[in-house]
């Protein structure tokens, strides 16, 4: 009972029995009471259970199906449908594999690490980041160009695991089911086809070092980063269930593929395929492990990245879509900023085409879009907060091409800023 019969009307907690005089707060419900201490205890229990669920990794029963994963990727990444399908299936199978590991089976399922091939700015990093967000797992990024094998100036491969551990708030269990994206992986290719007797500090040696953590090992991670030393305590992280996604532009790989598939005959009826016949992005879709071997990767490293996904180079149409369609589209972000100033921001179709063409000239893919917009919008974003009666700002192609000022529409008058 919530009211103790002790000759007084003193109320008590229905859970711990403490009276209202012994606690800070007593909250009443239908025929029951609960004190602030019991509420705090319940919160702690729920928080602990939530942490345990997160540590267990994504529940396969709640895990989005491949089609659902692709649908969410579509909201953030324009085009690249085939790559999205490959990623969705690989990620889904990866976490199904983790769930099956605790069950008796006569089949051993291999890890589905992924290799993403595609030009700069085609969406490789964004795809990996979005996957981690969908699955609610820790995510870390690393740049392969900074890595060297142990004992040389540079970053140890174990520091990649440290980044993931930090993303998981040093929860080792959660980190062990996270995703690591290694960018610029093509930069650690061997410098020549034949093994060298000299040390290849940032090439084959790094491949060998990465090989261990990608295939699964218990890594000793220095909690504060940096180089290892004997007096330092290490955190032990099992990388067996960490999904590794490696990405790179692989400049020159298209030539290797072209040499392999190109048919050359002499004399009449010669059937010669020109290198310009296919775009580099199309050629990359025909990549084989043998091509990667010739590019400079060791066979063991290629074998640990069994899933290949190719991203195509973005064209003008795709660039325009990227500007306005995704959930986090740049145009939507700028419009939201202006909306906070009670001003409508409009981009003409011509301005979107102009931004896209300027970005294509830079050959940095979608990465160039933001800097172009920042330069075009700087002055107007500086002025608008100080101006009154502004109703609308219109950005046309002249703002992009000729650095002209945007059109400002006031409450009753239209004039140039």
From Swiss-Prot:
Entry keyword Ligase: no
Sequence similarity: Belongs to the ClpX chaperone family.
Species this protein is from: Geobacter sulfurreducens (strain ATCC 51573 / DSM 12127 / PCA)
Gene Ontology annotations of biological process type: cell division; proteolysis involved in protein catabolic process
Protein name: ATP-dependent Clp protease ATP-binding subunit ClpX
Binding site for ATP: 119-126
Chain's role: ATP-dependent specificity component of the Clp protease. It directs the protease to specific substrates. Can perform chaperone functions in the absence of ClpP.
Ribosomal protein as UniProt keyword: no
Keywords: ATP-binding, Chaperone, Metal-binding, Nucleotide-binding, Zinc
GO molecular function: ATP binding; ATP hydrolysis activity; ATP-dependent protein folding chaperone; protein dimerization activity; unfolded protein binding; zinc ion binding
InterPro entries referenced in this protein's UniProt entry, alphabetically: AAA+_ATPase, ATP-dep_Clp_protease_ClpX, ATPase_AAA_core, Clp_ATPase_C, Clp_protease_ATP-bd_su_ClpX, ClpX_bact, P-loop_NTPase, Znf_CppX_C4
Domain named ClpX-type ZB: residues: 1-54
Complex formation: Component of the ClpX-ClpP complex. Forms a hexameric ring that, in the presence of ATP, binds to fourteen ClpP subunits assembled into a disk-like structure with a central cavity, resembling the structure of eukaryotic proteasomes.
GO cellular component: HslUV protease complex
Binding annotation for Zn(2+): 13, 16, 35, 38
One Pfam family here: AAA_2
CDD domains listed in its UniProt record: RecA-like_ClpX
């Amino acid at each position: 009972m919530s009211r103790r019969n002790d000759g007084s009307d003193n109320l008590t907690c229905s859970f711990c029995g403490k009276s209202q005089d012994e606690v800070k707060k007593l909250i009443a419900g239908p025929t029951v009471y609960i004190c602030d201490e019991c509420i705090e205890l319940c919160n702690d229990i729920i928080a602990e259970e939530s942490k345990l669920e997160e540590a267990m990794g994504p529940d396969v029963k709640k895990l989005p199906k491949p089609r659902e994963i692709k649908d969410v990727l579509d909201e953030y990444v324009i085009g690249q449908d085939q790559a999205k399908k490959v990623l969705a299936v690989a990620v889904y199978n990866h976490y199904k594999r983790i769930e099956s590991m605790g069950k008796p089976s006569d089949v051993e399922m291999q890890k589905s690490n992924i290799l993403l091939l595609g030009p700069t700015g085609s969406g490789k990093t964004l795809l990996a980041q979005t996957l981690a967000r969908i699955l609610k797992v820790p995510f870390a990024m690393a740049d392969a160009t900074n890595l060297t094998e142990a004992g040389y100036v540079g970053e140890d491969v174990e520091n990649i695991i440290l980044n993931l551990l930090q993303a998981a708030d040093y929860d080792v269990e959660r980190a062990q089911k996270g995703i690591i994206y290694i960018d610029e992986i093509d930069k650690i290719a061997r410098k020549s086809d034949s093994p060298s007797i000299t040390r290849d500090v940032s090439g084959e040696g790094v491949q060998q070092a990465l090989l261990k953590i990608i295939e699964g090992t218990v890594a000793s991670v220095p909690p504060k980063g940096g180089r290892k030393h004997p007096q330092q305590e290490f955190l032990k992280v099992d990388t067996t269930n960490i999904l590794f996604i490696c990405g790179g532009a692989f400049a020159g790989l298209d030539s290797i593929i072209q040499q392999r598939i190109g048919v050359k005959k002499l004399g009449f009826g010669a059937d010669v395929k020109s290198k310009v016949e296919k775009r580099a992005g199309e050629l990359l879709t025909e990549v084989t492990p043998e091509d990667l071997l010739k590019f400079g990767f060791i066979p063991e490293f290629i074998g640990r990245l069994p899933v290949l996904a190719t991203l195509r180079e973005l064209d003008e149409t795709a660039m325009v879509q990227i500007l306005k369609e995704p959930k986090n589209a740049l145009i939507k972000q700028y419009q939201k900023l202006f909306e906070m100033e009670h001003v409508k921001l409009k981009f003409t179709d011509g301005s979107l085409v102009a931004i896209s063409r300027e970005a294509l000239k830079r050959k940095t893919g979608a990465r160039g879009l933001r800097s172009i917009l920042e330069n075009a919008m700087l002055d107007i974003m500086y002025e608008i907060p100080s101006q009154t009666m502004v109703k609308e700002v219109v950005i046309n192609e002249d703002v992009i091409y000729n650095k002209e000022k945007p059109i400002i529409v006031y409450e009753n008058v239209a004039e140039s800023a």
